[in-house]
């Protein structure tokens, strides 16, 4: 210990080291504050620093040092009298010796007092609550509700039910939200919108779900324990099971996450019944399993059956379906913008229409897309091959992203084994199913109230999704009691009423209604949102569809009449949805990305079919919206883009339909002219429908018609010409070359319409010519009389003025 005496003391301390006898610790002074001991420890600290910068100094060996204790465990050395034998006592380091203020010579050290003052200033009210009368109360200052009757979870974290489920509370002067996994209050920026768990916990949760299942529970349990310790998660032990949250937390958590946990981690979820209240679904998650095969009306892409010669019969060229990707590898708050742009760029290659929605949580991308029937047929025939081509092919944007779930209409596929194998999953029988929605047309900018009928809807974690114009509309929903007949229910379906407060009055287009619960995701039913005139005409069109299904003139007047005709309304909904979607897509204002893409034949055919149907039904207001969007779309395109995408006959037919629709819309705006020439009332399509059938009802019935265009249409529509069956579904060249399989006849009532319009114009021209000739003859042969007549008319006009 001689080297210690040579070491200089601190600048402000002039203390000599104590004399040691044979380096025996028992010979140290027994004083409580022995400055020799202090200098000894201070020298140790300086030696540790000196060894880094200077070479070691040769000195006799030092006695072994006692391990350093933490400030919480350190205490002063007791005297020999207090400890009994001096040789048996254990030396502990003074807690002040590790303080930088004390080492620098600032005596006395005031750090403990400052720390205590800071703690008292930070949490004065919490300490007051802890030191109260012993009654367990909520830690929120403005609440302090009695939680003694609640479960152990709420008592441990000192939070009541209202504060735990509130969107935010004021705590320490800031808006905070309770994290049901951490058991603490965090600032609002730490949460995603609508979430009850902080972003860090959700990311940890997703990482746990992505781990491969292990047969032997030892390794998995060890990894789970390490991950839980690193994450400081709150674990409740009840009945020998470890659960990361209480049942109240699971009620507020994301249903899709809990549903997937049931397959991956544990079966210990607690069922519950959720109260029906207002939910904001602007950035809502929720994608469960799909519905049974027989419950998906949007995946039946056969043509709708025609009912005789009724004009309301309609079959769509490009049915609308749903494709959804549930991605587990991306954090909701860190979803790459570039990748999202790539996904939408890929979707923009689809031939007709699309509407995409992204929900956080497990990053769920849902797309409602309209494609030709032949493409849906190929996709339904071999879905695994097409999905493998897009997901598992190197270089694709989803390649190597790990596990994911793909919902393709009424089918479910999961990417397993580290993202290398795509497997189809069976659909649960108790999955929800929507029968119909009434009404299906709503005016933009006004409150929306609709009735939903379906099966297996009221289950735990039930929520409705109403998507429109790229976002989910906030709404409230409630159960509607179905009336009984003779003490027995006439229908097993359940009825719900959905109230949407407001919507954008300037946005028109399709909306989609879905429902999800713990059993999965239902089918979707489309709606249309437009202005008052569009809604009025859509109601008339819907009444014609009702007339085809209810020959005796039954009408829908109230919710009480719906229970006795659930099946009939379901059939009407599936029949009417094709026309409704085609009209809704047509009245939607085209986006900037869509105007940059060339128009293909499927779009031309769809526009021709929609225009033809609306012309026959004299729907002038809808025609005005469709024409405005179609003209805007055509003007922004290249002049030759229409010619390159389809044959001349389709282009000529489109121009004829646009001209005729423009005339009808113009006559509808001028009532006087419409009375002289009533639109569509004199159309020979209606009067002579047996002689000259409509294109709507007879697309493939005249094999000899349209010989000049038939070969080109068949060449484009044949599967071999567009590509092989194994070609990628989302390949741009294949999509653009695939068209409807129907033949377009040359004979139609459009020429009759054109001839009628031409004859009316010729008649007006003859009348005008006769009047001009009569006036010229009168001037030439009777100039005096004409002069007198002109003077008389002039005098009368001057007199009146």
From Swiss-Prot:
Zn(2+) 2 binds at residues 179, 182, 186, 198. PANTHER family: SQUAMOSA PROMOTER-BINDING-LIKE PROTEIN 4 (PTHR31251), SQUAMOSA PROMOTER-BINDING-LIKE PROTEIN 7 (PTHR31251:SF108). The gene is SPL7. It is found in: Nucleus speckle. GO terms for cellular component: nuclear speck. Zn(2+) 1 binds at residues 138, 143, 160, 163. Transcription factor that participates in reprogramming global gene expression during copper deficiency in order to improve the metal uptake and prioritize its distribution to copper proteins of major importance. Binds directly to 5'-GTAC-3' motifs in the microRNA (miRNA) promoter of the stress-responsive miRNAs miR398b and miR398c to activate their transcription. During copper deficiency, activates the copper transporters COPT1 and COPT2, and the copper chaperone CCH, directly or indirectly via miRNAs. Required for the expression of the miRNAs miR397, miR408 and miR857. Binds 2 Zn(2+) ions per subunit. It comes from Arabidopsis thaliana. A zinc finger (SBP-type) spans 135-212. Its cofactor is Zn(2+). One of its GO terms (biological process) is regulation of DNA-templated transcription. This is Squamosa promoter-binding-like protein 7.
């Amino acid at each position: 210990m001689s080297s210690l005496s040579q070491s200089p003391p601190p600048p402000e301390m002039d203390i000599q080291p104590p004399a040691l006898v044979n380096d025996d610790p028992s010979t140290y002074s027994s004083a409580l504050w022995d400055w020799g001991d202090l200098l000894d420890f201070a020298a140790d600290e300086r030696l540790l620093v000196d060894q880094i910068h200077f070479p070691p100094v040769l000195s006799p060996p030092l006695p072994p040092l006692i391990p350093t204790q933490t400030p919480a465990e350190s205490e002063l050395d007791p005297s020999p009298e207090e400890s009994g034998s001096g040789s048996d006592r254990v030396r502990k380091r003074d807690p002040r010796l590790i303080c930088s203020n004390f080492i620098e010579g600032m005596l006395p050290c005031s750090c403990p007092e400052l720390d205590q003052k800071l703690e008292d200033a930070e949490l004065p009210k919490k300490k007051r609550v802890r030191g109260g009368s012993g009654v367990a109360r909520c830690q929120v200052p403005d609440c302090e509700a009695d939680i003694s009757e609640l479960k152990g979870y709420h008592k441990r974290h000192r939070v009541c039910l209202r504060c735990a489920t509130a969107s935010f509370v004021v705590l320490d002067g800031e808006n905070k939200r309770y994290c049901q996994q951490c058991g603490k209050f965090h600032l609002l920026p730490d949460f995603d919108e609508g979430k009850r768990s902080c972003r860090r916990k959700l990311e940890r949760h997703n990482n746990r779900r992505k781990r491969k299942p292990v047969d032997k529970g030892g390794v998995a349990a060890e990894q789970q324990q390490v991950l839980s310790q690193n994450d400081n998660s709150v674990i409740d032990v009840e009945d020998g099971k470890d659960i990361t949250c209480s049942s109240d937390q699971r009620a507020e958590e994301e249903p899709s996450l809990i549903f997937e946990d049931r397959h991956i981690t544990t079966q210990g979820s607690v069922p519950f019944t959720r109260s029906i209240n207002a939910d904001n679904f602007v950035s809502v998650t929720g994608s469960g399993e799909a519905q049974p095969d027989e419950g998906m009306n949007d995946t039946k892409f056969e043509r709708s059956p025609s009912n005789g010669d009724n004009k309301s019969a309609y079959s769509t060229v490009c049915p609308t379906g749903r494709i959804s990707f549930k991605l587990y590898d991306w954090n909701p708050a860190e979803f790459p913008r570039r990748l999202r742009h790539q996904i939408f760029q890929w979707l923009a290659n689809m031939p007709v229409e699309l509407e995409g929605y992204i929900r956080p949580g497990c990053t769920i991308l849902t797309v409602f897309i309209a494609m030709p029937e032949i493409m849906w047929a190929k996709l339904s025939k071999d879905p695994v091959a097409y999905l493998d081509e897009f997901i598992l092919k190197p270089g694709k944007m989803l390649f190597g992203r790990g596990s994911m779930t793909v919902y393709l209409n009424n089918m479910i596929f999961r990417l397993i084994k580290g993202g290398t194998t795509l497997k189809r999953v069976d659909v649960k029988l108790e999955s929800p199913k929507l029968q119909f929605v009434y009404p299906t047309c709503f005016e933009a900018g006004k409150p929306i109230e609709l009735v939903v009928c379906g099966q297996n809807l009221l289950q735990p974690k039930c929520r409705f999704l109403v998507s429109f114009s790229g976002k989910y509309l906030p709404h409230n929903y409630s159960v509607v009691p179905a009336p009984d007949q003779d003490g027995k229910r006439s229908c097993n379906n359940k009825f719900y009423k959905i109230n949407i407060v407001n919507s954008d009055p300037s946005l028109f287009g399709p909306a989609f209604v879905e429902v999800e619960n713990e059993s999965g995701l239902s089918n979707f039913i489309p709606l249309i949102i437009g202005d008052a005139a569009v809604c009025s005409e859509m109601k008339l069109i819907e009444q014609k569809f009702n007339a085809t299904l209810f020959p005796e003139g039954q009408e829908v007047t109230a919710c009480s009449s719906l229970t006795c005709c659930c099946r009939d309304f379901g059939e009407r909904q599936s029949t009417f949805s094709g026309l409704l979607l085609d009209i809704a897509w047509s009245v939607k204002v085209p986006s900037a990305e869509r105007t940059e893409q060339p128009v293909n034949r499927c779009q031309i055919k769809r526009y021709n079919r929609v225009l033809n149907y609306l012309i026959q039904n004299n729907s002038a207001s809808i025609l005005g919206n469709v024409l405005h969007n179609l003209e805007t779309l055509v003007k922004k395109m290249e002049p030759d883009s229409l010619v390159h995408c389809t044959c001349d006959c389709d282009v000529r037919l489109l121009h004829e339909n646009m001209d005729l629709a423009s005339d009808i819309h113009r006559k509808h705006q001028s009532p006087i002219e419409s009375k002289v020439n009533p639109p569509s009332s004199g159309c020979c399509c209606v009067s002579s429908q047996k002689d000259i059938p409509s294109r709507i009802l007879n697309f493939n019935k005249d094999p000899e018609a349209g010989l000049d265009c038939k070969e080109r249409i068949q060449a484009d529509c044949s599967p071999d010409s567009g590509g092989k069956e194994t070609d990628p579904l989302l390949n741009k060249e294949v999509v653009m070359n695939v068209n409807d399989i129907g033949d377009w006849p040359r004979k139609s009532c459009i020429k009759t319409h054109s001839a009628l319009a031409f004859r009316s114009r010729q008649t007006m021209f003859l009348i005008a010519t006769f009047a001009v000739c009569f006036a010229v003859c009168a001037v030439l042969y009777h100039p005096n009389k004409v002069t007198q007549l002109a003077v008389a008319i002039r005098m009368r006009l001057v007199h009146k003025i």
